[in-house]
Amino acid sequence: MKSNPCPLTHCLFFESPHSLKTPATLEILQLHTSIPRQRARIEQFLAASGLRLDEVDYYAALVDEESGDIIAGGGLWRDIIKCVAVADGHQGEALANTIVSHLIARANAEGHHCVKLYTKPQNRQLFESLSFRLLAEAPQAILMETGVGGIGKYSQALRLISAERQAAAAASATASATLPQAGVIVMNANPFTLGHRRLVEQAAAQVGMLYVVIVKEDCSVFSYAERKDMVSRGVADLANVCVVDGSDYAVSKATFPTYFLKRLSDASDTQMLLDLDLYGRHIAPALGATVRFVGSEPTDALTCRYNKLMQATLPDVRVMQRYEVDGEPVSASRVRMALVKNSLSAAAPLVPPTTLPYLIAHLATRALRTELNTTPKPGLVDSRDNGSHTDMDHAIMMRGIRALHPFFVRLALLGYAPQLPPHGEVVGIGLEAERAMLAATGGVNTHKGALFALGLAVIAAAHAATHATAMGANPPAFLSATIAALAAAFPDTQGTHGSRAKVEASPVATLKSALDNAREGYARLFADWLPFYAARRRANDTYAPHRTLLRIMAELDDTNIVHRSSVDTMIQVKMQARQLLNDFSEPGLEAMNRSFIMRNLSPGGSADMLSMVVFLYGITRQ
C-alpha cells in the first residue's frame, strides 16, 4: 500500500502496528545521505511510499540481513523526526514504532528532550497512544511532539511575561481602568530597519501592550543574539513594547522551513497553516494577544502568501503599509545589499541609529574575509594555498574570523557613545576576543594583529557615528585622530614581533611597530593606501585588493618579515613589491608567492593593513 505524495517534504508515512515483535533478520543501520549510493537507496525507498527525502542529520533503516532490502526507515534533523516509512507488505509489524523509538532515543542522547514529528492527520490517534501530543494541524499534516519542556515550557514563559507586564500596567492605571488588548509582531529583523521601527510604532499606538517576537532560527546574516539586542535597543523608548524570545514554535525551520528558502513550493501552504495554527493555539493565548500585526509585502511572493493566509486564519490581522525612503520600501535586504557593497553610507539612512554599531561590526568581519579571500597573495593564506604558513589554512582562518565577530559587535557598542570608552574596557574585550580566537583555532594566532588594528578602527567608526557634525567634511581625519587617541593609552610593548624587530633594526634603521602606527592614527593608511584603494575601486579594478596589498608592502615596515628573516630582507621585499606594482600581473603575484614560500616569508602586517583599508573604505565612502 502506497501513500499519496505528501505536500510536506518531511511528512511521515506510518501504519498502525498489530504486533510487538520485529523479525529476527532485521537490524537497524545508519545510512549516510552524504554517500551518493546510500542516499539513492533512501530516496528509492521513500519514493515507494510517496515521500521525498528532506534534510536530515541522521537516517536509520531496518534492513533485512538476508536480502539487504530496507524494510523501514526514518530520519532525524535536530529534534525533528522526518521521512518515516514502512515498505509494502510489512505494515502491522510494529516496525515504524521501532524506528521512531530508536530516533527518539538518538535525539535524547544528543540533548533533545522534546522531540517533534510531522504526520498525516489520520495518524493522530496512533501517535497520541505513543505519548505524542498535538501542537498544530493543517488539512494535510499535523505537527506533534513528545518529551519534557516543549511548547508547554515556552507558553509558560510567555504567560509569566504577560502577567508581569499586565501587573505593571495595572499598577500605573486608575482603579476603574480596564487593560486594553495586546498585539504581537513576529519579525526576523535581519537587521532592524526604519521599516521595522515604523511598524512597531504604528502597532504600539493601537494596543495597550505590544509583544515583538524575534525569529530565533540562526541562519541569517545577523545572529539571533544580535537581532534580538538590535530590536531591544531600537524600541527601548516605547513603554508599551516588550521584546520576547523566539522559539522553534514561531517561524522556524521546524514549523516553516520554506520561509528560509524564500520560495513558494507545494509544501508552503501546509507549513504556513501549521505555523499560524501553532500561533493561534499556543502563543497568542499565552500572551493574551488578540491582534497580529504585519507589514505589507509588495515584492516577496512567499511573505505575501503568508500574510494572506494569516488574514484568512486569524481573527484580527492588521496590515501596516511599508515605510519608504527615496521612493522605495525600506527592507532588511536593502541594508544587507549595502553591506555586500561595503557601504555604510548606503545602509545608514535605512536603519535607526541604534542599528549602526552592528553594521559597523559586520563591515569589519567582511573586511577580514575580503583579505583572506584575496587570491593569490605572496606568502599569505588565501583560497588557493597556505602561503608560508604550516600551522594555518583557509578553514582555520575562517574559524578565527567567526570567533572574533561577536567581539567586534561589543567593541562597536562600546564605542557608540559621545565619549571614548575607558581604556580598561577596551583591553578587557580585546583579551576576551584573543582567547576566543585561540580556542576556535586550536591555539593558532590567526588574527592578533588584525584584532588590535580593527578593534581600534571599529570603536572609532562607532564613535564617529555619534559625531556626524563633528566629522564634517573630513571623516578620515576624525577617524585617524580618534584611533590615535585610543592607541595613546596603550603602553609600550615588549616581546611582540614589532618590539623585537625595532630592537634588532636599531643599529641601522628606525622601524615603526604596529603600536607606533596606531599612535600616529595610521597616517600613511589614510593619506595613501585608502585613497589608492578607493581609486582602484572607482575604476572597477578587479585586482584592487591585490594592488593595494603590494602598495602597502612597498611602504610598510612589516615586522612580520623581520621576525621571519631580517631587516635587509624587509627592505628587499619593499623593492620587489614596488617593482611588481609598477608592472602588475597575476602570474607575477604567483611567482612572488612561490618565492616567499621558499624563503618562509609572510607579510602579515601588510595583510592586517589591507583589512583595515577595506574596512575604512566601507566606513568612509560616499
Segments (PLM) and residue ranges:
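Short amphipathic alpha-helix that is part of the acyltransferase structural core
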Residues: 11-14, 21-53, 63, 69
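Conserved beta-hairpin
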Residues: 57-72, 447
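Conserved beta-strand in the GNAT
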Residues: 68-85
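Conserved acetyl-CoA pyrophosphate-binding loop and the N-cap/start of the following alpha-helix
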Residues: 90-102, 195, 199
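Conserved GNAT acetyl-CoA-binding A-motif
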Residues: 107-119
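Phosphate-rich cofactor/ligand-interacting catalytic cores and adjacent structured alpha/beta frameworks
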Residues: 357-423, 461-594, 600, 622
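Long, hydrophobic/aromatic-enriched structural stretches that serve as scaffold segments
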Residues: 406-463
